[in-house]
Amino acid sequence: MKTILRREDCTMSKYLLVVDIGTQSLRASIIDETGKTLSFSQQKYKEAFFSVEKGYAEQHPEFYMDELCLATKELHEKAPEYLEKISGMVMMTFRDSSLILDEDKKPLRPSILWLDQRITRDPHMSYLKWYEKILFRLIGMNDTVKFNAERTVTYWLKKYEKENWDKMRYFVPLPTYFNYCVTGNLLVSTGDCAGHYPFNFKKGKWFSSLHPKSDVFSIPHKSLPGLVKVGDIIGEVTEEFSKKSFIPVGTKLIATGSDKACETFGDGCIDESLAAVSLGTACTIDVVSSKYKEPETFLPSYIAPYQNAYDLEVQIYRGLWMIRWYLDNFGANDIIESQKLGISVEEYMNEKIKDIPAGSDGLVLQPYWGPGLKRPNAKGSIVGFSGVHTRYHLYRAIYEGIAFALREGLDEIMKKTHKKPEYIVLSGGGSASDVLVHIIADVFGVPCYRSTTVEAGSLGAAMAGFISLGVYKNEKEAVSHMVEKTEVIHPDMKNHEVYNKLYKKVYLKMYPSLKGVYNSCKDFYLDTKGE
């Protein structure tokens, strides 16, 4: 018979189990109060998601729990002395992925993930009351509301899976189900409600059923899960889950935040003096404030993984995804050449572009390959082509375009904070590129430094957990004990002058100049044709 570890049998210690449920892999760590990772396991998914139709992205929620158990089992095999002495556990998950459950809290279908591109058209916006339509038009948010609603899966489920919709009792953010599997409590952290839900981030609660945002998302109010404030306890590990996972029975599951919020905290960004830039498939820029401020008009800031703080975030949906797009379409020869040299194609391309002057000889790219909330009709654009440009200029222009878009995001945030960050902290896979890091420093004209760990999200979640347990009094104390600062990269101010001119005279004028063209051409785009 398998031995069941019990929380009360374990001596108090300063270890936390941190579970990072990602899109491509699941990582489990044991982290101590100094920020040191004592044991680590990563489970790379054989199939991150499946698509029953082109553009769909779904996954069975049980899949993630199976991967979690594999990871914690490996931790137990590697270093049982740590897992058996944890003081608690925290979980963080990717955002904006939904699940519907029946009366018995069982999934009715796979979860629809944030990568999913299905759209449900309703040109008349019939989900809104007549006065709401007038209101949204008056405040200039009609297109943004329509964009949000079309990508809210409730409408698709009602239209194409009515039988499942009629059986639905609970409509929940995906982390809710994970919490239920671990503790038996169908609850979700207020830090895990980013997405297409009627959530009031300022007050940390669901909007009432009478609020216009409830009409936009069309989720029955009675179907939404109970909420737990960040830092509070969601529940304790059940005996059933302990048997499968080797996590001690009674271990407290602490409510934290989403992946990006935890990553920002793990970067050490806790006030408006620092900005966190995450360079991944999607790129984000975050600034943390103790007061609720919307980063862009009518778009919310998110709850930080500790109390009384908010993340003002602007996202570039197609961030370093652009590099993969470039290589898939134009990089065949470069991939071959890099293989001959025994280096990655990214290293090879960085060598090719490092001597191209700042501004790519006047080639400017706007990375709207994926639509944004504020500009739902925008598309990607490249201007300035001439005979001097090569494919390497285009590659560098992608880097610069991402940096321009992030700077534009920071400009929007600074309109609310009225403060320019003293430093920018870089994390994510793209931060490994020296060329990209220097471009960002030069575009912003602000010193930058890299996060000390590739697992900044796990570190941030652990810090939030230690604050909850009382190991640290507040976020400032946690950062001082657990986050290290790396070498500072200073901007080249001559390059900054070049980028400043391009940014103000070209980049910022591209969308206003092309907005009418985008509207006229939308019937020719594959993803909007027939609207």
Residue spans of the language-model regions?
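Conserved donor sugar-nucleotide recognition element shared by glycan-biosynthetic enzymes
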Residues: 61-64, 68, 149-150, 234, ...
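Short acidic-aromatic active-site loops that bind/stabilize oxyanions
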Residues: 54-65, 142-143, 227-231, 251-255, ...
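Well-ordered alpha-helical segments embedded in enzymatic catalytic cores
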Residues: 67-71, 263, 401, 405-409
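N-terminal phosphate-binding loop and adjacent alpha-helix
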Residues: 42-84
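Glycine/Thr-rich phosphate-binding loops that ligate phosphate moieties of nucleotide
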Residues: 5-44, 87-125, 239, 287-299, ...
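Active-site-adjacent loop/helix segments that line or gate small-molecule/cofactor pockets in enzymes
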Residues: 57, 61-64, 260, 280, ...
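Glycine-rich phosphate-binding/catalytic subdomain of phosphoryl-transfer
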Residues: 70-340, 526-527
